[in-house]
From Swiss-Prot:
Species this protein is from: Bacillus cereus (strain AH187)
Annotated NCBIfam families: L9
UniProt KW keywords: Ribonucleoprotein, Ribosomal protein, RNA-binding, rRNA-binding
Protein role: Binds to the 23S rRNA.
Lineage: superkingdom: Bacteria
GO molecular function: rRNA binding; structural constituent of ribosome
PROSITE patterns listed in its UniProt record: RIBOSOMAL_L9
InterPro entries according to UniProt: Ribosomal_bL9, Ribosomal_bL9/RNase_H1_N, Ribosomal_bL9_bac/chp, Ribosomal_bL9_C, Ribosomal_bL9_C_sf, Ribosomal_bL9_N, Ribosomal_bL9_N_sf
Annotated protein name in UniProt: Large ribosomal subunit protein bL9
GO biological process entries: translation
GO (cellular component) term, any one: ribonucleoprotein complex
Amino acid sequence: MKVIFLKDVKGKGKKGEVKNVPDGYANNFLLKQGLAAEATNSSMKTLEAQKRKEEKDAAAELENAKQLKETLEKLTVELKAKSGEGGRLFGSITSKQIVDAMQKSHNIKLDKRKFEMDDAIRALGYTNVTVKLHPQVTATVKVHVSEQ
């Protein structure tokens, strides 16, 4: 019996796959558990339409990420912090503070977990911070820390 997997089934198939499985296995397990649906003409058409929609959504998401990258790479995020001798900060600048500053000054809202910082910023001056917007799109934001 041909079935369309609705969920990943270990050793049998992944979500969205169409496979031929034994009738008893399909009727007694896959269909009853809601793990698969019978592969009829209408369900095949629905699956194709769903795949096209997912591809279209993924392409739109990638395009949005590319546009956001262009915007971010033109920006400089300005932050003020107290510092001691030699330009060392009292404390540090974290990704959350960068996100808050971007929200206030440029009205761009990002998740702080998208910032790839090995360590917090601990010195005055300019620092480049990478932001992973999409698995295929990475931007660099310039952060300027000045004395308060």
